[in-house]
Amino acid sequence: MSVEEGPTAEEADPLDAFRQFFALERDVLVLSLAMFAFSLGFQMTSRYMAEYLYALGTGAVIVGVFGSVGNVISALYPYPGGAISDRIGSRYALTVFGLLSTVGFAVWLVAPWLGPLAVPAVFLGLFLSQAWKSFGLGASFAIVKQAVPPSQLAAGFASTETFRRTAFLVGPLIAAALFYPFGSGDADVVLAFQLILLVAVVFGVLGTAAQHLLYDPGGDSFGTEFEGVSQLVADLRNLPAELRPLLVADTLVRFANGMVYVFFVVVVTRFLGTGLDLAAPAVGDLSLSPQSYFGVLLGLEMLVALLTMVPVAKAAERVGLKPVVALGFFVYAIFPILLINAPPGDAAVLAALFAFSGLRFAGLPAHKALIVGPAETGAGGRVTGAYYLVRNLIVIPSAALGGLLWAGFSNPLTGEEVFAGDPTVAFGIATAVGLVGTGYFALFGEEFEAYT
């Protein structure tokens, strides 16, 4: 990291966003550009994976298993990714992770051509595509922590999150445009999604090249050599006390979200079957398939996130991190029950719900600041990785549980049906669990001292 002077409050001001990128260190700018590229790929693809699997002939149980495998990856990747980053530096770590993710997008692209191996290939692509997002988590946290003073961490994360969420706004709109000429049949969904994956591969190559060529590793802070499982156990035992109530609440909220998150696209496209028919005088009648409209909804969600993220991060400097994080938890918790009970075919109601859902992202910079803030310099990657390891290990079965509640299940010994399956029940239970987590954090969550 190139550092000529110690970072100041001005350097961490996210309101200077697109002028020398929030006036932060060059490394945060480079990280944000890479985040923009990869987030385009992730947002165009990951939110549609359940629809892709349905189009390839699977159902809710396989989709749930896919979600839980993703949770396994999220649990296992961040800690070694953070340790690798602390050991070899962020530049080389993120380059390797970026290449792996790009290959993963390519595997998804060719999966439909593999016949009976199509679904296994989708699972293989998942292990690869998540490398930058999950392996690189500790590295990205460490870069921001090195460049931003403790009292400005939320603003620093708001800077990177704003570029990342800008990609999350653009990505779904690209997906919506690519779905637009196609119908809602499975063959059309597969072809349109392959075009989306091709775009993701291109952005993956660009993002990897940008972070490798532009990032200055000169000021990377290196931790000690990774000592294996013993170090992992020590890191878990030595998690700062401030993180423990946050970890409990975050785990409950994420478990709830994990039960249903992968099914959001299926709710819109197949359960509600809601597209958009709009009479536009300038261009004539506009008709979007449910798949295309889902991309518009994701774009709307991200637009709200972008409009609120920076002001909320600044507000956190006045009111503290805890209220902001609690707000995000509440929106996470209540959204599933609202979505599953939306009236079928009502595009306006879905638009309002996804706009509301965008508020959950407003608390993410504060949430990340609350995680990484107490960490010692040189260990930010490991602390972040250890935190996410614990959370994501517990969250692993959530998507599979959601799939079983959606599709139903039988007694494996007798074949007798135990539960017929009900998407509304699955989403209702998810909301209940999320509200428990939100309440726990409201009661026991602690504030980071730099914000008191």
Residue ranges and their predicted role:
Residues F179-V201, W406-G434:
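A membrane-interface helix-boundary motif in multi-pass transporters
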Residues A118-G136, A347-A362:
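Hydrophobic core of transmembrane alpha-helices in multi-pass small-molecule transporters
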Residues L99-P116, F330-P344:
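C-terminal ends and interior cores of transmembrane alpha-helices
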Residues V201-D220, G437-F444:
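C-terminal membrane-cytosol helix-exit motif in multi-pass small-molecule transporters
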Residues S2-D13, H212-D235, F448-T452:
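Flexible cytoplasmic inter-helical loops of multi-pass small-molecule transporters
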Residues Y77-G89, F179, T308-G320, W406:
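Helix-to-loop junctions at the C-terminal end of transmembrane segments
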Residues K322-L364:
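C-terminal transmembrane helical hairpin of 12-TM major facilitator-type secondary transporters
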Residues D13-I73, E242-L297:
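Helix-loop boundary and gating motifs at the non-cytosolic
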